[in-house]
Amino acid sequence: MSIKFFLLVSRQGKVRLAKWFNTLSIKERAKIIRDVSSLVITRKPKMCNFVEYKGEKIVYRRYASLFFVCGIEQDDNELIILEVIHKFVECLDKYFGNVCELDLIFNFEKAYYVMEELLLAGELQESSKTNVLSAVLAGDAESEADAQQDSLQKLVGSVKKR
């Protein structure tokens, strides 16, 4: 199982997250995003969640107003990828508390961080939601401590100048 790309696309076709696990030019990425988004968005809800695209498979799942889309090799297992997508959504739900599109727009770096804890080089790295969330929360605590230390140093620096 190797994911080539992971996209989050709104119903309007706006890309909310894009993670590429293969090296592609910006032009190729834009074409894939355009083609795959229009392919997935226009499908009816009762249709299969797997689509052929240029010798690859597209696996997608819709949650509320977002499509979670993965591009995989032809011989990879689609059902495992659906589970990976679901695991990612569950992790986002736990982290944000019932995640919505606005959470992903305004906190996209956190969503990427959750994805990076879950996936490594297109492979499932961590299957435990608890481990993923504890790593993300530890990173949050560390960045919070760094921010406090930076503001404290700025405050001390401004006092010394007086």
Swiss-Prot record:
The organism of origin for this protein? Schizosaccharomyces pombe (strain 972 / ATCC 24843)
What name is this protein filed under? AP-1 complex subunit sigma-1
Where does the UniProt annotation locate this protein? Answer: Cytoplasm; Nucleus; Cytoplasmic vesicle, Clathrin-coated vesicle membrane; Endosome
Q: Which UniProt keywords apply?
A: Cytoplasm, Cytoplasmic vesicle, Endosome, Golgi apparatus, Membrane, Nucleus, Protein transport, Transport
Q: Which family does it belong to?
A: Belongs to the adaptor complexes small subunit family.
For this protein, the record's Pfam families field holds: Clat_adaptor_s
The lineage's top-level taxon is Eukaryota
Q: What happens when the gene is disrupted?
A: Leads to hypersensitivity to valproic acid.
Source taxonomy: Eukaryota, Fungi, Dikarya, Ascomycota, Taphrinomycotina
